[in-house]
Each structure stands twice: as C-alpha cells, then as structure tokens.
Amino acid sequence: MTTKTRSAPAVPMFRRLMVANRGEVAVRIARACDLLGITPVFAVSAADRDAPYTRGRESVCIGAARSPQSYLNMQAIVQAARQRECTALHPGWGFLSENPVFAALCEAHGVTFIGPSPRAMHLMGKKTPAKQAMRAAGLQLIPGSDGILADVDEARAVGGRTGYPVLLKAESGGGGRGMRIARGPDEV
C-alpha cells in the first residue's frame, strides 16, 4: 500500500499565522502550518500561557483567563497579530470563527482571515436568507419550507408536501441547537 503525501509549496502563502484558538484546535492548526512551512503564533489567554501546545513555540498573551477578555477580544487578537507580524489569522472553530465583524476587522488591519468573507458570513448567517441566496444562485436545495413557518399547521402542511420525517430548525439556532426530528404530523 502506498501513501501519497502532499509537499509544502516552495514558498508558503503566509510566513507567519496567528492561531486565535486553544487546545486541540490550536494543535491541529499548528500541525497544518508546520506541513506548509508557516510559523504558527499562538494567541493565548493568561490561563493557557503554559499549555503543552505552546512549548517551544511563539505565543502572545491576549488577555485574562476568561474568554470574553481573551479569545473573544477582537481588538486584542488583531493587535497581537499585527505586533507579531502575522499576515494571516486562523480562528479555528467556535469563539470568533463565524463573526463577520471580526473577519472585517482582520481585513481592515491587513491580516488575512482564514475563513469565509464577512459578506459570506452575513449572507449565510441566517437560514432563510441563506436558502434564498442559494436558490437565486441556481443551487438545488433539500425540499422544505421557503422561509419561517407561522405555526404548527403550516409545519404540518410542509411535512405533508415533502414527506416525513422532517427536521424542524429554529431560525436562530446554530450548531445543532433548536433542531428536532418529526417522524409524522403528530410529532410536529
């Protein structure tokens, strides 16, 4: 059995990348950076200064142990990236990874945000407008409602039209929150 490995580009796209996350997320990003010949720089809270993944690596403290003062502090993270001459920033997942304001702040300060553009985040941030945009782009969608349903009767009508089971989703739910499977009209 042969295994194919990807080689790093001769010249990496970015020389230094700010890792704006912690734990396993930071480890995975650093591993990818190493493979690509990019120097990862860890943005860490005071509590994570001596985390195993930072040993022998460059890190910068961005605030107190609590995440609102560190991993959610947009200004501190972008300032740290600029101070450490990072031309790119990887948010990982969670924290600020889906925050269009943060992505725009990175762009405004000349730091490439590794992730969707602020425009894409705004467009895809809510289920109904996202679905409308995808339909307008000619993409095929899973059958369902065309927007927010007014009541249980409307949900049952959609289920009757598309067939059960159906997945009911809260408009502002995210990450699996606010979802429920209804296997028939009596479960709606």
Regions found by a protein language model. Give the residues of each.
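N-terminal beta-alpha lobe that positions the nucleotide/phosphoryl donor
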Residues: T2-V188
